[in-house]
Amino acid sequence: MSGDAPTPAHDPAAEGLEASVPLESVASINSDEGQSSAQSAPLADNEARLQQLEQEHSSLREEHETLRSQYMRIAADFDNFRKRQSRDQDDLRFQLICTTLSEILPVVDNFERARQQLEPQGEEAQALHRSYQGLYKQLVDVLKQMGVASMRVVGQVFDPTLHEAVSREPSEEHPEDVVTEELQRGYHLNGRVLRHALVKVSMGPGPQSGASPSSAQPNDDSTATFQGEADPAQPGV
């Protein structure tokens, strides 16, 4: 019949080729393909794991830098706090010492006034005078050991950080703003002002002499003396 499909021609060569390929070779090819697929799967897993570890490492490194910065700030804040505490303790200690010494300085003033005003007559009066002057010397020695030094202000340029002006008056001897008289002695304590000196200040006119604010530096312990301390005219000292 004309409508039937043509029957494929018999190809003896093809049949021979198929027959020539062993079944073992086909199985080997399929096995190699399976092994290749099995090996590629762990490799992909390792790459994914490596990427994950790199991300975790990057995250940990950022966290480390953040914590390190926080630690450095905390360490700096603590160091500043420690220094501030040390300064505050030093200031408090200085204020306590100043408060105590401020109560003692009027006693020193009274000793000095007595030394200037009293003129003992007779052996008994002079012995008594030497006795309390000995006490005064002991007091002065203790103050020096604590770092107390007296100011020398007459002839120096007025300095409000060291001096307290009680009055201003004309002077033909001193230029303007130069201390002309000390009314109450001032003192340093280890280089810091313990008590301001009460002074009179010149209004001028006067010769422009070499007055200088050298009183800004405390007297050296080897040369600083309290008022009248080394006066050879006084007996027993």
Curated annotation (Swiss-Prot):
GO terms for molecular function: adenyl-nucleotide exchange factor activity; protein homodimerization activity; protein-folding chaperone binding; unfolded protein binding. Its main location: cytoplasm. The keyword DNA repair does not apply. Residues 204-218 have a biased composition (Low complexity). It is found in: Cytoplasm. Residues 1-52, 200-237 are annotated as: Disordered. GO terms for biological process: protein folding. Residues 27-40 have a biased composition (Polar residues). The keyword Chaperone applies. GO terms for cellular component: cytoplasm. It comes from the Bacteria. Keywords: Chaperone, Cytoplasm, Stress response. SUPFAM superfamilies: Coiled-coil domain of nucleotide exchange factor GrpE (SSF58014), Head domain of nucleotide exchange factor GrpE (SSF51064). Participates actively in the response to hyperosmotic and heat shock by preventing the aggregation of stress-denatured proteins, in association with DnaK and GrpE. It is the nucleotide exchange factor for DnaK and may function as a thermosensor. Unfolded proteins bind initially to DnaJ; upon interaction with the DnaJ-bound protein, DnaK hydrolyzes its bound ATP, resulting in the formation of a stable complex. GrpE releases ADP from DnaK; ATP binding to DnaK triggers the release of the substrate protein, thus completing the reaction cycle. Belongs to the GrpE family. Homodimer. HAMAP family: GrpE. PANTHER family: GRPE PROTEIN, GRPE PROTEIN HOMOLOG, MITOCHONDRIAL. NCBIfam families: PRK14143.1. This is Protein GrpE. It comes from Prochlorococcus marinus (strain MIT 9313). The gene is grpE.
